[in-house]
């Protein structure tokens, strides 16, 4: 097994718990979007990441490793969801970088402005707490974005390389 395939396999296994986490979030977003239909676009985008993760994992296990014939439908599912997931992972990456390179003063200003607009916000939640949560979430999304972008790039290359498996 080449180094590229070893990395791809590791990234695939890393994406599975991330996809399960996002599937759980997607169910919550779906429940809240029933009262706000414009949020359904976010449900669709997050669902694409989950679908991409599991269809690409199926392609890895049955197509690449066992060289079993795959349907054209599987190829279409991988490619369509890969492009939407690439968009989402790029957003994760760009937003995380912008938050992580911002100074604490700038972010604290935005957080304080946000807290002033929230009328019944609990006093126990301070701007420092929100800042640390924001930075932690940004690191998680940065890692997710990098893993996703590298994985999607490799998947699209493998789909092209193993094109003969799709009938």
What are these regions (language model features)?
Residues 8-14, 21, 40-47, 77-87, ...:
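Physicochemical signature of membrane-embedded alpha-helices that form the seven-helix bundle of GPCRs
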Residues 104-126:
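Membrane-interfacial helical/loop segments at transmembrane boundaries in membrane proteins
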Residues 2-5, 56-74, 99-107, 142-167:
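Cytosolic juxtamembrane helix at the C-terminal end of the final transmembrane segment
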Residues 80-104:
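Hydrophobic alpha-helical membrane-insertion segments
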Residues 23-31, 60, 97-112:
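Membrane-helix interface motif
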Residues 1-58:
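Transmembrane alpha-helical insertion/packing segments
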């Amino acid at each position: 097994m080449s180094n590229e395939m070893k990395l791809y396999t590791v990234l695939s296994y890393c994406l599975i718990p991330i996809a399960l986490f996002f599937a759980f979030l997607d169910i919550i977003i779906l429940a809240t979007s029933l009262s706000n239909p414009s949020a359904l676009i976010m449900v669709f985008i997050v669902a694409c990441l989950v679908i991409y993760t599991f269809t690409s994992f199926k392609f890895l296990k049955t197509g690449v490793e066992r060289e079993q014939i795959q349907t054209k439908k599987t190829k279409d599912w991988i490619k369509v969801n890969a492009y939407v997931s690439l968009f989402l992972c790029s957003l994760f990456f760009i937003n995380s970088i912008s938050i992580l390179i911002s100074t604490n003063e700038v972010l604290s200003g935005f957080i304080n402005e946000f807290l002033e607009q929230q009328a019944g916000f609990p006093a126990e939640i301070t701007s420092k707490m929100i800042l640390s949560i924001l930075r932690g979430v940004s690191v998680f999304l940065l890692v997710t974005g990098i893993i996703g972008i590298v994985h999607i790039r490799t998947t699209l290359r493998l789909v092209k390389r193993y094109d003969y498996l799709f009938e």
